[in-house]
Design a protein with these regions (language model features):
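Cytosolic histidine kinase catalytic core of two-component systems
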Residues: 92-93, 136, 211
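Active-site catalytic microenvironments for nucleophilic, acid-base chemistry
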Residues: 40, 128, 197-201
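Mid-to-C-terminal catalytic subdomains of enzymes
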Residues: 101-146, 150, 235, 241, ...
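Core alpha/beta nucleotide-donor-binding catalytic domains of modification enzymes
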Residues: 1-126
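AMP-forming adenylation/ATP pyrophosphatase catalytic core
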Residues: 9, 29, 77-79, 123, ...
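Alpha-helix boundary/capping and short turn/kink residues
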Residues: 65, 69, 131-138, 153, ...
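Secondary-structure boundary/capping positions in well-ordered alpha/beta enzyme cores
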Residues: 3, 41-44, 136, 201-205
């Protein structure tokens, strides 16, 4: 290894400041550090060691939280700069490879702390399912995620096509959609177009929950002029002059 970079971060303090959970805080600071090093060494990819088991754990976590179908795809092999070269390899096979080649794996001790949701799924839930219901649960869940990913890709393509049909104006700080055409769409497309629009405007749709989406659909359906919603900090949705205004105020 040519260079090694490390950094000590007070995750608990970060979580408190951002008002998020410890697990999410740990993930955020980790990837912020990866991005920092990536820029420092002029790299264009960040390789992380997620494996097939991690993917299944993520699917189960998202299912327990009531995720939409996007979340049930699990971890993807590539997300922007992030690549996951061993995402299709089971943890057991990785451990066997290390053993056969006299490689000492670096194990995070916190992985055994079952107070964390992911660890409880990894150490308790999945072994229980394997023992009591389906010894091939990993492969079963992977097949499910592949079906979902295929259907989700189709829906995403459809959403992009419908979005272009109802798009009136797209600026840095606001997007305007045709109200009449939006109201004529099926509900599932309305929901996805709302998320797609917010994502285009703000670089992501974090913080936009099911209740916010339903409120926006209701606002558009009732078509009461000059009514607006603020579903998230810095985001305003306004219905006016037969248009839907998505306004980024940050």
């Amino acid at each position: 290894m040519k260079d090694f970079y490390s950094k000590r971060i007070e995750v608990e303090q970060y979580a408190n400041n951002k008002k998020i959970g410890l697990e999410e805080a740990g993930r955020k600071v980790r990837y912020e550090f990866f991005e920092e090093v990536c820029n420092k060494v002029n790299a264009n990819k960040i390789a992380v060691a997620h494996n097939k088991n991690d993917k299944v754990e993520t699917i189960i976590m998202h299912a327990l939280r009531g995720s939409g179908i996007s979340g049930l795809q699990g971890i993807q092999a590539k997300t922007n700069k992030i690549i996951r070269p061993i995402i299709e390899v089971e943890r057991q096979n990785i451990e066997e490879y290390c053993k056969q080649n006299n490689l000492e794996a670096r194990i995070d001790k916190s992985n055994f702390d079952n107070t964390y949701t992911r660890n409880k799924i990894r150490n308790v839930v999945i072994p229980y399912i394997k023992e009591e219901f389906n010894p091939n649960i990993i492969e079963t869940m992977i097949r499910l995620s592949e079906v979902i990913a295929e259907e989700n890709a189709f829906l995403n393509k459809l959403v992009q096509e419908e979005y272009q049909k109802i798009l009136l104006e797209e600026k840095v700080d606001q997007i305007l959609l045709d109200l009449k055409k939006f109201n004529e769409l099926d509900n599932i497309l309305k929901k996805r177009i709302i998320l797609y629009t917010v994502s285009n405007l703000r670089g992501g749709s974090q913080g936009i929950e099911k209740i916010h989406i339903e409120d926006i659909i209701k606002l558009c359906k009732n078509n009461i002029g000059n009514k607006f919603l603020i579903p998230n900090k810095g985001l305003k949705v306004l219905v006016k002059d037969k248009k839907i205004f998505f306004i980024n105020e940050e």
